[in-house]
């Protein structure tokens, strides 16, 4: 339990950040344990609504891997992966779209609205928000990359104080649906919005670690060159590589900072954005 003086200190520490980030866009990729655990999910949504009420303009991009796997199993379709990427044939694509757009997205929208926010659920198909292209690996099926982002619809929503919630599914000009990595979608959206302040990736790790098995080796602040050097020396490895590359790409296109943080921590978003110390890894140019 905080004392009265500690409560005042917390509020005082947050004030400069509230002033600095007022009316600025933050793009948050949401997935992992924070999506599976109901308590963490409620806290993420509560943080999101709070940030909206104090003047920030959050955009939420989500995945939904565990829910997809649940429905594939229920329909007796065996999930397949290649180097950690979901192999997406047409039956799998149908399930991915049903789950991400029809279930996960609408549940998040309803939760935001229930907590007092105003939210609109979207997929990449809505308003031609995302134009995909095949990723070039035929064995992966309908796994896509981002070819283009049209931000007009997002700007209308955030300018009217709505929180866009985006499922990472899109369709090409022939109407073929593609499953796109949610980290990639979040990074590309942040990069295409000229006044995006932050890209935040919620993960199941503390951030970028010098020793992947030791949370105390968290690197709390680094620039693009340092991130590239750590990748070359294999300090950054495995599943962290595409996340860091996503951050680097968004920074190179004008996003002020990119953050990788542990979504399993209570109120991770508020701690990262509104405190001096933060809790994750912040990348800057």
UniProtKB/Swiss-Prot annotation:
It catalyses: N-acetyl-L-glutamate + ATP = N-acetyl-L-glutamyl 5-phosphate + ADP. Coiled coil: none annotated. Keywords: Amino-acid biosynthesis, Arginine biosynthesis, ATP-binding, Chloroplast, Kinase, Nucleotide-binding, Plastid, Transferase. Belongs to the acetylglutamate kinase family. ArgB subfamily. GO terms for molecular function: acetylglutamate kinase activity; ATP binding. Pathway: Amino-acid biosynthesis; L-arginine biosynthesis; N(2)-acetyl-L-ornithine from L-glutamate: step 2/4. Catalyzes the ATP-dependent phosphorylation of N-acetyl-L-glutamate. Substrate binds at residues 64-65, 86, 179. It comes from Pyropia yezoensis. The record marks 29, 243 as: Transition state stabilizer. Its main location: plastid. This is Acetylglutamate kinase. One of its GO terms (biological process) is L-arginine biosynthetic process. Its EC number is 2.7.2.8. CDD domains: AAK_NAGK-C. GO terms for cellular component: chloroplast. The keyword Zinc does not apply. It comes from the Eukaryota. Pfam families: AA_kinase (PF00696). It is found in: Plastid, Chloroplast. NCBIfam families: argB (TIGR00761).
